[in-house]
Structures are given as C-alpha cells and as structure tokens.
C-alpha cells in the first residue's frame, strides 16, 4: 500500500506480582493516510513518531497510576488534538468552504455508555466534549451548532477557526480542488484518495479491567454539505465492550459506516469466538473488497 500508516504505539504494563487483575494496556493511532510515504521527509517522520510517543506516555502514566481508561483515552487524544501534525483539533483538514468541522466519539466498555459530537466549528478538544455529552446529557450524539452550544454551556474550551488552520491544510485544500476541477493533470489517483483519510484514536484497558475507546478527526479535505464520516458514529468508528474489545477506526469513512466496522469486530469476537486479530483482519478485508481502505486498533 502506498500510504504511510501512522500506526501503532502499544504499551502494556503488569504488576511485579504478575497479578492479571493489575494488567493494563494502551494503543494509539495517528491516522491512516493524509501523507504519502514518498512525501514524508525524515524530519517530519521523526516529528510524527515523537508526538505519538509523547501522547502514549501520557496515557500510560495515567493507567500505571491506577487511573481509568476513560481518562487515559481522553488525555492521550487531547495531546494529539493539540498538535498541528494530525487531522484532529488544531491542524485538522479544511472543508469546501475553507473551514474546519470536527467530529469525535467515545465509548466505555463496562456499561456501553457513549458520547459523540460532529460538525463542530469551535470546540478545541472534541473528544472531551464527546465525553461530556456522555456524562452530562441524556443524549449520545450532538451535531453542528447544537454541539458547540452544548460545549459553551458546559464550560468546554472553544476557539476561533483560525486556531485550527495551518498552512499545510490550506495548501492541501487548494490541491484537492485543483484535482477535482481537472486543473491538474499530473496527480495520481492516490493523491486524491489520500485526502479522504485521517483520524486519531486511542483504546485502553485499565487496572479495573475496563475498556474505553475514543476517536477524533477533521474528516476529509474538501468535504461538502456537512459531511460526517465514521469517526463520531458509535459502532462504525468507535466501539468498546468489556465482553469483547475496544476499537478505534481510521480510514475511508463512508465504507466504515456501511461496514459497521468497530461493532462488527466486537460481534465476531463475542458471538463467533474469533480472536481479536482474526476478527479485525476479517472486517478490514471486507472493507477492502467493498472498495474502501483503512485500519483499526
């Protein structure tokens, strides 16, 4: 595959007494796509690796100190949202109108509680607001102005659009518009497809045996009509159940929605007793046959 996958950093910890009840683990991804391997300089690649390492350390330390998987997932993703390198929060891709629209979702496996937001134009850390929706409302998913209003009412940090925008994303929008307008003839299909991918995510297991999963994204470059991908959709982009697994997806959202990717993996584990590796492989192969691509943790 031509794309570079900013996957995966995995850490698992055990107590010195090897008590399985004290095991914990965390896995993160920085998205599939958004940058082609041949366009990645060594310097930029090192920046990505360092940012991912720093992010996973945040979650690891929380879990190691006995913190919850919810907190570990939230704070790890917060770090990635605050970095201009990733397609989430600051540095997210731009839509057709040159604006950022942000999506995020969170789910905890112990009780199947979940929260999500989509189409936000000013929430600094969408994953935190998704968790706030879960904990402080009777709803699961809020969108657009409603999500932004909810964030303000609950004292979540909001910022102006210029905070999110970077020169790299502005240039990417111009490039993809040229492709779609047939003004540039020397760009490959992969140049076009790579603009459709990109997300950050984290799954974690805490010492209490509880799983959590979270996903945050700016979606696809040049998206129109308030398009929403899989990232904020529970069961497609994010899923967690203590009976099976925790999943965060990254890839071509339309296919991941149609394939109900995150839940499908958990269902294969719970109802067909497949291993997590076999279940994930089966579902990703299904998506590939449909014409999509991407990955999961």
Label every PLM stretch briefly.
Residues 1-7:
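Sec-dependent signal peptide recognition
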